[in-house]
From Swiss-Prot:
Function: Converts heme B (protoheme IX) to heme O by substitution of the vinyl group on carbon 2 of heme B porphyrin ring with a hydroxyethyl farnesyl side group.
Keyword entries, A-Z: Cell inner membrane, Cell membrane, Heme biosynthesis, Membrane, Transferase, Transmembrane, Transmembrane helix
Pathway annotation from the record: Porphyrin-containing compound metabolism; heme O biosynthesis; heme O from protoheme: step 1/1
Keyword Transferase: yes
Protein name: Protoheme IX farnesyltransferase
SS bond partners: none
Gene3D superfamilies, per database record: UbiA prenyltransferase (1.10.357.140)
Membrane topology type: Multi-pass membrane protein
């Protein structure tokens, strides 16, 4: 039994890697925050559970398609060369079947157990990432992250729609925050993985415009991000607790970006990249805590 289970476990692990679980977790986390912010009190737990499940399934399906489309590119990059699609240990049909199963299940869950609006918005996000970003933008323009960032910024709106069956201005403010966060996050990665992107032939900003230009734009975007994160307080969507958190976290982001701009090192770029992930999680966590504190008043 153990000899039979080992290959099956290995295959399941390879499937899991194709769904980019860490990236999926952050996206779903932001969607869940949107769900709780959408309700004046406690949201309908069935919508939270099934909304989370459906969004996770479609996100995983999109990432699997991304790995399938980019398998030749991934094989040339050190960071992604071990993916099953890049090594050819999983066939195209297997990946398509996995994506179809996950995506189909996600759409059914969202349509029948949440609401049609959430399903269509999540499906549009799937198309935006798996097709428009991966196929059209990423291999053709250094602004791929800027233009294609909208699909990655959508989770709060998807979560909001799951609970409220609408997407008001407050939800789009959250989308805007992630949209502005995305370029400096990925450009930091592209800086210290520059050789990978050169080998892959992808026109990331450091490849096409150089390191100094990219570092300047990371710094400029960090200031824009700090300003954008003040919007929830400005429109009275959040209170002083969130404001203090946004200023502190934004100040740290600017500080990292300033250091990177003044004196580059791969270690600093890697540190900024990792901090940016923590930054987004803490910022959205602060939004939720501030929301709950407001409900208790």
């Amino acid at each position: 039994m153990s000899s039979l289970a080992a290959p099956q476990t290995g295959l399941l692990r390879q499937y899991l890697v194709l769904t980019k679980p860490r990236v999926t977790q952050l996206a779903v986390f932001c969607a869940v925050i949107g769900m709780f912010l959408a309700a004046p009190g406690m949201p309908d737990l069935s919508h939270v559970v099934f909304g989370t499940l459906g969004i996770w399934l479609l996100a995983a399906a999109a990432f699997a398609i991304n790995c399938l489309i980019e398998q030749e590119v991934d094989a040339r990059m050190l960071r992604t060369a071990r993916r099953a699609t890049a090594r050819g240990t999983i066939s195209d049909i297997q990946v398509l079947s996995l994506s179809g199963l996950l995506g189909g299940a996600g759409m059914l869950v969202l349509y029948h157990l949440v609401n049609p609006l959430t399903m269509w918005l999540t499906f549009a996000t799937f198309v935006g990432y798996a097709i428009i970003y991966t196929v059209i933008l990423k291999p053709r323009t250094p602004q791929n992250i800027v233009i294609g960032g909208l699909s990655g910024a959508m989770p709060p709106a998807l979560g909001w729609a799951a609970v409220a069956d609408s997407v008001p201005a407050e939800a789009w403010v959250l989308v805007l925050i992630i949209f502005i966060w995305t370029p400096p996050h990925f450009w930091a990665l592209a800086l210290y993985r520059n050789n990978d992107y050169i080998k892959a032939g992808l026109p990331m900003l450091p490849v096409t415009h150089g390191q100094q230009f990219t570092r300047l734009h990371i710094l400029l975007y960090s200031f824009a991000l700090l300003a954008t994160t003040l919007l929830p307080y400005a429109i009275r969507m959040s209170g002083a607790l969130y404001l203090a958190s946004a200023l502190a976290l934004g100040g740290m982001f600017v500080w990292y970006a300033w250091r990177l701009y003044r004196e580059y090192s791969d270690a600093l770029a890697r540190r900024l990249f990792r901090f940016s992930i923590l930054y987004l999680a803490l910022l959205f966590g602060a939004l939720l805590i501030d929301h709950w504190v407001g409900l208790l008043r």
